[in-house]
Structures are given as C-alpha cells and as structure tokens.
Amino acid sequence: MSVWLPASGKVYLPPSTPVAKVQSTDEYIQRTNIFYHAYSDRLLTVGHPYFNVYNNDGTVLEVPKVSGNQHRVFRLKLPDPNRFALADMSVYNPEKERLVWGCRGVEIGRGQPLGVGTSGHPLFNKVNDTENPVSYRTQASSTDDRQNTSFDPKQIQMFIIGCAPCIGEHWEVAERCAGDNNDAGRCPPIKLVNSVIQDGDMADIGYGNLNFRTLQQSRSDVSLDIVNETCKYPDFLKMQNDVYGDSCFFFARREQCYARHFFVRGGKPGDDIPGEQIDAGTYKNDFYIPAATGQTQKNIGNSMYFPTVSGSLVSSDAQLFNRPFWLQRAQGHNNGICWANQLFITVVDNTRNTNFSISVYTENGKVTDINEYDANKFREYQRHVEEYEISLILQLCKIPLKADVLAQINAMNPSLLEEWQLGFVPAPDNPLQSTYRYIESLATPCPDKVAPKEREDPYAPYTFWNVDLSERLSLELDQYSLGRKFLFQAGLVQKTSKKTSNVSKGTKRKRT
C-alpha cells in the first residue's frame, strides 16, 4: 500500500544570496611591467646566547640576548609608490587609480660559517639514564640530583613572508572552572594561545611550544635560553585559512632532530600509574605486575621519561638561505601585495649557531709573562653573532578606485584609504580668520593645547627589526645579483649577437 510518510533525513539547502565573498588581489589589481630592486645593508647583531646581561643593580641592559634559536622578524618599510615621479606618466591615472607594490622575488642572505651551538643548564633535572641503566633506581639519592647537562637543539631553517606579522601559537596556563579543586600541586589546565611572533621570541628547540615560565616552575627542566621564555611555533593552519592571506604569502621550512639521550625526571610523579591506585582492583595488573617483597623493584621508579634532542648534521647541501625564491601564486587571497607599503619577513636559522668563547686575563701585566696556567686568572665570556642581508624584487601594480574594490579594502583595512587621501574635500571656509597678537598673555583666550593626533601604528606594541628601504630602490636590475637572476629566469635578458662581416675574395691573376 502506498502511503505518505515523514522524511527521515535532513534536507540541506544552499545558502541564501547574496553570499559575502572576498576577492583575490589578482581579480582587481593590474600589474605593470615596471620592476624595482630593493636591498638592505649588512644587518648585524651581537649578544649573549643564553640570557640578557645587566649591570650589578639590574637596571641597565649591558648585553642583549642574541641566540641562534630566536626568531628574527624584519619589518621592511617601502616608499609610497604614489609619490614617485615616474618618467612615463601614462602608467596610471592618479584620479582613478592608486599604486601599490607587489613582491615577486626575495633572497635572504646569511653570513657567517655553518656551526652547531649547544645549550644546557648547570642544574638540569636529570636523575637517571634510562637508555642503558646499570641498576634499578627507585628514587633520588638526595633531595637535589640536578646535573650540569648540555645538548644541541633541534635543527630548524624557516622563513615566512607576508605584509602582516606572522601568527604564532603556544600552550599557556588556562583558568580553572569555578567548581574545580585548586589544591597546591595540582596540574593546571592548559590552552592553546595565538600571539604575534616578535623579534627575539624563542623558537621550538625540541621541548615544545609552551610558556616555560608558568608551566615549569622548577626552573630546571629545560636549557637556560628558554627556561624563563615562551617558545612559539608559527600557526600555519590559522594563516593558511586566513580570509585575506596577509600574514603568509608563502613560507619555506626545514626541521630535523633525533633523540640522542633518554633520561628520567626527578621529583614526585603528579599522575600515578593506574596500577598503583587503590581502585577495587579495576586497574589491577593492567600496566605492570607488582614485584615481590624484598625486591628493589617493589618501590616502582619514576615514569617521567624525556629525551634530549639533537639537530644532527649541519650541511650546506640543504640550505634555504642565500638563494632566490620567486612568488608566482600565493597560498591565500593576497598574491604578494604589500599593503601599507611594508613587508614582514620572519626568519629562524640555527645552522649558523656557533657561540664564541672569549677569554680575558684578569691580572695586571701581559699574558706573555705568565709562567704557570691558573684558571682563576682568566674570565670566560660567550657571544653569538648573526649576519643578514635582504634583497627584493618589487613589481609596480595599480588599483582602480571602483566602488566594489574600495568596499573590500575598507572592510579589510580602513587606514589604507586614509593614506590614499580619498576623503571628501569640503568647500573652503571664510578666508577671513581672527589672529591674536599676544596669544600667550592672560588677556587673550587660551591657545589650543591639543596637538593634532598622529596616525597610530597598529604594530607599535610589538618588537620588530625595522629596516628602512624607502631610499634603497633601483630600476637598474642588471646591476644587482638578485636582479640579474630575475631577468634571466623571466627571459628578459638581451642576448648579444655576434656581428659577422662578409670579406670579399680577391680575384686571382692568370698566368701569362
């Protein structure tokens, strides 16, 4: 029998129109055939590889922290192309168009030789070697079994390019719920936090991306360079799904590590193995079978295992730096357009991680007068240096001042329209104005003390390595290394042809 029955499944309907859609920059930006080469000076930085060095009072920073495991975030300031006096004024119409920069190529130069740098802690929480144990050790021999331990960090090469700062992620302490037990010694809840990666922020060296200051209160579980820091890792998932794609045009990375040694922590385990818990036999013998009375294994040892990582071989065969990268299509909607005339380059490279050891004689006299070596008469210092050089290929692009284009730019960043001076120009006021002679006297009205408000920098609270390229642009691409590479790969190099000359042969005389 044929009867009507209710539908058992859900019906999916299309979204109601209109649907908001973000256009790609390629849909409304017109690219010209004018290219510029931009380059920076040799960028150098020197400091201590593990911590900041202050004076005796702790008020003056004498030596900054400069580590090979830090992020270097360059904020490149580009000139305003709308202020350029172009030789060909037919390139764009200033009444209907505006000019912007498009990044087409980049080369991040690194100086200094390859080298491996070590890090460590003089009081490292390492109780026992669990890779090759000699005897079963159930507990620490004293209340403090920390050791002086060092290791080489995870090897990492990475750079991220965008017109907005790179977004990082790390784990942080989260707030407890109102009804949770907040007894001392309980493990806190943790949450994933997004933040801007700034110049000097530590990268992950093999111990995770978390706030070690708040989550490791023993101050002995990691090395000195990160024990009081927050290690960040770029949030590639968030940047790849960004609706505008400003934080990451493209990136390149190479990471490698392996576990070199295997240790166990000291201290009380916060989470007992379920086999130890009195739970009416629920977990009996699920994880281990108890040892007999009188055996050393009767008191089970600590289970807080961890490795010390190693970055392994550093080789010039796998370098991301000192080579050009060309941008044809970005991963997001922004295909290399440098909004607000700026570019952010986030770099991590610890393949040039050599830490200099500098020894200084502390006594009066010369080193040549020493008869016997005495270690107490020498003071040892450590320094780390870094060397960078950045080159860019910029393409001149123009934006039509149409309603739909301006609407999207206004929704994305309204300050861009203010820089382009697109506001309505009001009619001039009455030309006759009042001017007081003795404006500072008590007899006249108080002058306006409110200074005109300057445009606020949205990235003022953050720390970057500012590089001014406003006077470092050139049209002579063939005069620079990256420019010649760009001309060659784009097929714009003029091939010189050899001139051939026809030589007329002389007539041969007949013998008579």
From Swiss-Prot:
GO terms for biological process: endocytosis involved in viral entry into host cell; virion attachment to host cell. Coiled coil: none annotated. One of its GO terms (molecular function) is structural molecule activity. InterPro entries: Capsid_L1_Papillomavir (IPR002210), Capsid_L1_sf_Papillomavir (IPR036973), dsDNA_vir_gr_I_capsid (IPR011222). One of its GO terms (cellular component) is host cell nucleus. The keyword Disulfide bond applies. Pfam families: Late_protein_L1. Belongs to the papillomaviridae L1 protein family. Forms an icosahedral capsid with a T=7 symmetry and a 50 nm diameter. The capsid is composed of 72 pentamers linked to each other by disulfide bonds and associated with L2 proteins. Binds to heparan sulfate proteoglycans on cell surface of basal layer keratinocytes to provide initial virion attachment. This binding mediates a conformational change in the virus capsid that facilitates efficient infection. The virion enters the host cell via endocytosis. During virus trafficking, L1 protein dissociates from the viral DNA and the genomic DNA is released to the host nucleus. This is Major capsid protein L1. The lineage of its organism: Viruses, Monodnaviria, Shotokuvirae, Cossaviricota, Papovaviricetes.
